[in-house]
């Protein structure tokens, strides 16, 4: 222990000796957190329309328990008139830090004052400007997660130095301004200007501080319901959606306050819909920002789309407790907030809408995404070591958003619902408006349950990868089970053995299935509880989806399931079985053409819209990635005809919508393209469905990518029809699919050289640039895209880098592309996080090549 302390002190000394380390190293953060407390920010921003920057003034108060130099974080702006406890100091910015001289600081409270400017841009900055082309209005908003607050104002930009914020904003008088707290007062200060004062916040981390400004309108203002704001050009659209959005949020507040035994922790709760917002939502304390398109659908929505919106709203709402009220100490515990927010969103919706079979939807939305990453060489543990916050962006992805909630469902099954809830209550109560780590939550669960969770946490939280669970069983001559065993192996071959609690399902032709509880803590275990039971038709090892891992059907069960799947009445079980069959395709154990044949035969009768949508997505993936050209050419006409027929004749509107999407996805031949053009021209329509702008532009994209003879005229007609701001974005996205070398060059140059292009325009166009049938055209851009990855990491928001890789690597299917990626990994000097992301994304390309070689 003494040796570790010496090492830590040496590391801290080294950080201080290097006056301005790059980013925010863990050692610097620990040193500051150990010395600094009682942080208070008083911030004034002046927002000027169309200006490339904002000006501001800051008064920062904090207490020190030991004197000496302090580093303040600030980058990409300028500072002036810096005083420290009344003494002038140099306002130099070096490597993203301002040095506060130790000679001017003292133990106890200190006061730092300065003027500053910070950049504003359409993309790539902490303060974003959006110009609404529909009415020429302007909106400015902030987005600081994980460590971009220091691009907006000087601060201690680490999650465990919480501060109280008092904000003042000067903006045009016609603008509405929203922040974490309510406005206390405002003052007219000149022609057309208003100065607004906001009340002081409770202690929050810098990444949770926020403001938005512009001609927003408050939608459906109703006492007792959360506030909802939208840009003025979308007010009418928002009015129609607002009651459902506000009502589910209001119900969620009541449910979560009772579940956590903790009232809503902030004075008010507003939601602000923002155009071009980089994420689905961001949970600023008391003021969640939402991507406008996630709330106001640009396509005809299905019932699943509406439920997914509920999940988004409840996810961000849960963060007000799990993330804002109690915050992880460092971003290596990012999963602690994201995993719980995702899990609790489903837990809450399952209680608010008990008829919706929410845990089936949890499986569909969560588990495949998690398994798809966790089986790759680029996966990470849930707990991710992040030595420097500059690398925190790479921690975001399916591991924290999908594996973490999947593991939490397993933990709730292990502990029991009551212990799980009581543990969360104890954890939140003990860390109110403070910071905590995973170990704190483990101790809370252990306290209420009396169970030791160290072995469980060691494998599930600290170890990467996942188990594959296999079942072996046999029956005697009297048709009773005489042998039943479970075994597991690490899918990465790294020797992991996980503690797994699961429920087995023994299914029979007649009569109810039998559920058997089982525990697998070693490489192999016999299940004595199954012995002597009647011989089942098939066995599935993860009934109700309590466990986490790959659960493939044994050969006997798989053969039975493929014969009887259409008659499985339990929709949750039917969904799980389809998922297991698809996993068998991805593991090259089941020929993709066999899966496609089964799916195309059974999906027309599938009345569960969410499952039908999954199956259609698998069919499209199978056609575009896993089968060879001859097989695809043979199957596509059947798929096109089926989609066209079901689009017109399915009894449910939701099904007609997903079959319309299916036709757009599988369309390849002339007849299908004619049908799409008929929908665009108005010569045809989907019964009962009003196609929305993005529906139409998606059809235009397909027609362009398929090089239809009328593509140019179709594109021009839609541009004329939809000249809105959104229409201009969709036109940009669609044109990226043009199958010409000139178009690809123009777009790629724009991606890497035009910082003014809004980030959501670029991100949405990446998939159309890499359309499934254009891999020969886009292969020359694979290496340049990989070369640009460090630039993307530096300049773009959290999820953009993953979208970049998924598009450019995911757009390829050939051994040549795989070889190029592997050679790049061999020779490129990459940061560890970027190397892992490439390994993660290239796994699908590797699988594609393997499947095509196995089933030529």
Residue ranges of predicted features:
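Extended, low-hydrophobicity, Ser/Thr/Pro/Gly-biased non-transmembrane segments
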Residues: 115-220, 243, 548, 570-579
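Hydrophobic alpha-helical and helix-loop surface patches within well-folded domains
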Residues: 2, 31, 198, 228-493, ...
């Amino acid at each position: 222990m003494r040796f570790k302390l010496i090492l830590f002190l040496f590391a801290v000394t080294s950080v201080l000796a290097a006056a301005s380390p790059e980013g925010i190293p863990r050692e610097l953060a620990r040193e500051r957190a150990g010395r600094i407390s009682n942080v208070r920010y008083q911030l004034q921003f002046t927002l000027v329309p169309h200006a490339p920057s904002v000006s501001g003034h800051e008064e920062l108060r904090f207490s020190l328990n030991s004197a000496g130099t302090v580093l303040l974080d600030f980058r990409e702006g300028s500072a002036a008139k810096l005083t420290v406890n009344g003494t002038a100091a140099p306002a130099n910015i070096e490597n993203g830090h301002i040095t506060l001289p130790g000679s001017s600081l003292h133990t106890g409270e200190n006061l730092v004052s300065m003027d500053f400017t910070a950049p504003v841009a359409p993309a790539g900055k902490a303060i974003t400007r959006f110009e609404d082309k529909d009415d020429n209005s302007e909106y400015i908003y902030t987005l600081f997660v994980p460590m971009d607050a220091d691009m907006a104002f000087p601060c201690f930009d680490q999650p465990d130095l919480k501060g109280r914020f008092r904000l003042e904003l000067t903006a045009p008088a016609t603008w509405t301004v929203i922040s974490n707290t309510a406005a206390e007062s405002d003052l007219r200060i000149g022609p057309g200007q208003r100065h607004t004062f906001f009340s002081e916040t409770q202690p929050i981390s810098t990444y949770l501080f926020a403001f938005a400004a512009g001609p927003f309108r408050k939608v459906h203002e109703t006492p007792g319901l959360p506030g909802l704001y939208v840009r003025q050009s979308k007010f009418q659209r928002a009015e129609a959606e607002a009651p459902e959005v506000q009502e589910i949020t209001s119900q969620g507040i009541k449910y979560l306050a009772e579940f956590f035994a903790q009232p809503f922790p902030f004075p008010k709760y507003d939601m602000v819909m923002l155009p071009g917002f980089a994420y689905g939502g961001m949970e600023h304390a008391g003021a969640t920002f939402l991507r406008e398109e996630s709330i106001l659908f640009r396509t005809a929505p299905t019932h699943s789309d509406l439920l997914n919106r509920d999940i988004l709203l409840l996810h961000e709402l849960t963060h007000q407790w799990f993330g804002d009220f109690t915050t992880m100490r460092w971003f290596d515990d990012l999963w602690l907030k994201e995993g719980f927010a995702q899990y609790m969103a489903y837990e809450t919706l399952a209680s608010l809408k008990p008829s919706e079979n929410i845990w089936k939807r949890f499986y569909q939305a969560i588990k495949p995404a998690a398994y798809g990453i966790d089986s790759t060489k680029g996966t990470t543990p849930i707990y991710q070591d992040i030595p420097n916050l500059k690398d925190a962006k790479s921690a975001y992805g399916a591991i924290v958003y999908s594996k973490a909630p999947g593991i939490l469902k397993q933990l709730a099954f292990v502990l029991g619902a009551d212990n799980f809830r009581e543990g969360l209550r104890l954890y939140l109560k003990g860390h109110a408006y403070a910071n905590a780590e995973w170990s704190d939550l483990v101790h809370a669960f252990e306290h209420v349950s009396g169970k030791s969770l160290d072995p469980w946490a060691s494998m599930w939280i600290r170890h990467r990868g996942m188990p594959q669970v296999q079942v072996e069983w046999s029956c005697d001559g009297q048709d009773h089970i005489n042998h039943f065993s479970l075994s597991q192996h690490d899918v990465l071959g790294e020797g992991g053995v996980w503690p797994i609690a699961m429920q087995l399902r023994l299914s029979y032709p007649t009569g109810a299935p039998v559920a058997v509880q089982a525990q697998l803590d070693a490489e192999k275990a016999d299940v004595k509880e199954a012995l002597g039971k009647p011989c089942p038709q098939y066995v599935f090892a993860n009934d109700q989806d309590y466990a986490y891992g790959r659960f493939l059907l044994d050969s006997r069960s798989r053969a039975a399931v493929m014969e009887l799947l259409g008659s499985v009445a339990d929709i949750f079980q039917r969904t799980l079985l389809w998922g297991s069959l698809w996993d068998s395709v991805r593991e090259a154990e089941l020929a993709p053409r066999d899966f496609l044949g089964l799916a195309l035969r059974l999906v027309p009768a599938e009345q569960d819209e969410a499952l039908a949508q999954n199956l259609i997505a698998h069919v499209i993936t199978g056609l575009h990635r896993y089968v060879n050209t001859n097989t695809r050419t043979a199957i596509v006409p059947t798929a096109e005809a089926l989609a066209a027929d079901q689009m017109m004749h399915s009894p449910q509107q939701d099904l007609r919508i997903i079959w319309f999407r299916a036709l757009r996805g599988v369309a390849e031949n002339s007849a299908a393209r004619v049908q799409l053009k008929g929908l665009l021209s108005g010569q045809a329509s989907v019964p009962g469905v009003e196609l929305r702008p993005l529906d139409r532009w998606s059809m235009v994209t397909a027609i362009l990518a398929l090089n239809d003879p009328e593509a140019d005229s179709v594109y021009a007609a839609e541009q004329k029809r939809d000249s809105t701001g959104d229409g201009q974005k969709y036109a940009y996205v669609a044109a990226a699919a043009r199958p010409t070398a000139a178009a690809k060059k123009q777009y790629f140059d724009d991606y890497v050289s035009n910082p003014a292009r809004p980030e959501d325009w670029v991100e949405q166009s990446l998939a159309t640039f890499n359309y499934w049938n254009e891999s020969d055209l886009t292969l020359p851009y694979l290496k340049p895209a990989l070369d640009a990855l460090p630039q993307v990491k530096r300049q773009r928001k959290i999820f953009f880098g993953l979208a970049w890789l998924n598009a450019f690597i995911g757009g390829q299917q050939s051994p040549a592309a795989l070889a190029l990626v592997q050679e790049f990994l061999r020779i490129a000097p990459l940061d560890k996080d970027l190397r892992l992301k490439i390994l993660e994304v290239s796994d699908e390309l590797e699988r594609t090549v393997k499947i095509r070689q196995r089933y030529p």
